[in-house]
Amino acid sequence: MSSDSCNQIIVIGNGFDKACGLPSSYGEYFNDRFQKYEVGGKILPSLQKAIEKEGIGDIPSLWDLLFAAFHDEETPFPRWMDVESAIRNYLWPSAGVNGHSFDSTIGVWRKFFIKRAQGTYEDFQQAKKQQNQVERIMMKYISQKHAVEMVHQTGQKSKDYNLDDLNWSETRQAFIDDDTPKMLLDELNRFEEDFGIYLYKAVELANENDDKYNSHAEHLYRCIGEYDCLVPIARQRNSVVSFNYTTPLLDSVDDEVMSSLYIEQNVHGTLPKVVSQRDLLGDLDPPINIIFGIDGYEAPKGNRVRRFTKTARKLSLPRQELPNRMRGRRMFDPLYDGESIQAVKVYGHSLGEADYSYFHALFDQIDLYESDTVLYFLYSTGHETIPEAVGDLLDRYGESLRPKAHGKNLLHKLMMEDRIRIANLDEQN
């Protein structure tokens, strides 16, 4: 790259936080939340007993119950892309499905377990038993939550309300008749809030230790920015697109890092500076505005599932608070100023389909096919980028190009022009 100027877009995913020592994966959150229920590698049996004995107070959301079932089926989610894929498959198991009643949603789980049976009678009976267990836990959870809502609506005190008096069939029907996607979205909000509290505490703890998270983030950002770039970090103009909820770079005390950081956009929301506990109604003040979701690229118009897409949910997020010097800036300002963007550097992102729309828009904006922009997919030892994921991303983007011949030869063109590289930061000279 030129030694005179360097405009870059740096895309960071959860692998960035992980490389900085933050326990931010779904697997780490799940273990923190449910480890106490695990007996012999299984969670559901003791979780069911706990709900029946103590109620739902310690269970953040319905989604945690669904993911607990995946855990017991030996299909854990080590990465957020797997969680978001599960959300998509659960809500929208096949294209063209216009929402679900609760009964049909339960049916998805019935198929999930039966599909795992290997054809023998014993396997089928075991799958049926597991499915019934999940359904029972889910209905118990929903029934108790509905009972609490009824108490609030009627002004009764919880201690005077007998859950055993609840009409099971009426309660179940109330949720079937209600807008089930809305209920599931409300539950997803609770799941997001609970993860936000967990992550906030993890950041606090990481920065209290000598091996500080913010310091690691500054160092890693500097390594990414200076990789294959002759311009020192202080003279770069970098736009950071973060798929994380943390903002260690915005909190940086390193003058060179701050001068290079033109703007940072946290795509899926940010943690507040202070996280409070829930009030008596279960609300947080200030609220935690972070989102999980599914990609809306192929979601049919008018489909109730679209409310779960990241694009739709991002519209409801409050505007990100930025330092005064960053206000009014835009990621593609160099292009609007008649300059070029020399590099797009991706670090720590799984490249899963849940975020495809963002990469599609980014590649369109920089005119990937015709421009001179170089794509870097960078990683550190132990946090490797999967070449197949890079190929899949570019192949899918190529399908959108016209004429079609451009799309078919996109990856070859980038390689011939030396405009795509997968590299280990630890091996930089």
Regions found by a protein language model. Name each.
Residues 1-20, 26-29, 41, 45, ...:
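SIR2/sirtuin-family catalytic core signature
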Residues 20-21, 250:
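Short N-terminal helix/helix-N-cap motif within the alpha/beta-hydrolase-1
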Residues 22-24, 278-279:
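Short aromatic-enriched loop/helix-cap "lid" or pocket-rim segments at secondary-structure transitions
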Residues 45-323:
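Extended, H/D-rich, highly charged conserved domains that either
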Residues 316-336:
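TIR-domain catalytic/interaction hotspot
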